[in-house]
Amino acid sequence: MFNKKKEDKMKAKDVITQMTSGDTFYITYYAKKHQAIITRKGTWTKPNTDIQGKHFVSKGNDIFVYWDLDAMPNDNGNQWRQATNPMRVKL
């Protein structure tokens, strides 16, 4: 069966290159929470710190943790979000 999500996903090394090559980026991915494809503005590094995002693989999916500049902070001031199998990352 044809799986469009897998076909559209970027390679992990290309995503990391885009996310770390500039100050900010736009990342597009399917968000289960919203049941929709979303685009967010983010950074690889938490602002005013040297704390970086990360990449890992879980159950065959590429997971990217990034600082979401569009997000409302939670009670702890956290704006870290995770994107699973991003379709696009651009500066």
Q: Could you say what each language-model-derived stretch is?
A:
Residues 38-59, 74-75:
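Acidic, low-complexity, intrinsically disordered interaction modules
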Residues 17-21, 59:
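Short, 15-30-residue, compositionally biased linear elements
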Residues 2-17:
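Mixed-charge, Lys/Arg-rich low-complexity intrinsically disordered regions
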Residues 61-91:
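Short, compact, well-ordered microdomains
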Residues 21-29:
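A short, Trp-centered hydrophobic/proline-enriched beta-strand micro-motif
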